[in-house]
């Protein structure tokens, strides 16, 4: 009779990857995710961005986080976050918090419109009122696939 190992090995986090139109900027998102945010602030509305969030670099849980590489320019119209664009094709790739608590990684979001549609089609949309109330709005059952034209 052999002993059975009952310790579960950690399930790897799903990986979602995206890139800008010209391919110069690439991001990798490694964390469980169920929602993508559609924000109605003046910038997100104009670009049609849909966001998923985690920490830049290694996340809080092992095997999670966001990595982004490429030649990007920063646009920071407000006080708390910077938007990251490809310098060549100007796709909006991500935003990054300007500050983090001491010793903590920076909070970041990547634009799922730069991912393969099949990788993100199932994500539910969380509407965020970034224009007036700065609050999440009730879920309405729509998913990212409902936003592809």
Task: Report residues per predicted region.
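A short Gly-Trp-Pro
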Residues: 2-19, 24-149
């Amino acid at each position: 009779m052999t002993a059975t190992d009952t310790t579960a090995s950690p399930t790897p986090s799903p990986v979602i990857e995206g890139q800008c139109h010209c391919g110069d900027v690439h991001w990798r998102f490694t964390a469980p995710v169920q929602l993508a945010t559609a924000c109605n602030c003046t910038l997100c509305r104009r670009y049609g961005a849909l966001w998923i969030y985690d920490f830049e670099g290694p996340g809080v849980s092992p095997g999670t986080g966001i990595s982004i590489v490429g030649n990007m320019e920063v646009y920071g119209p407000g006080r708390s976050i910077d938007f990251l664009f490809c310098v060549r094709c100007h796709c909006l790739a991500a935003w990054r918090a300007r500050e983090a608590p001491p010793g903590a990684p920076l909070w970041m979001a990547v634009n799922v419109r730069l991912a393969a549609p099949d990788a993100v089609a199932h994500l539910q949309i969380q509407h965020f009122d970034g224009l007036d109330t700065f609050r999440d709005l009730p879920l309405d059952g729509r998913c990212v696939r409902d936003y592809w034209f």
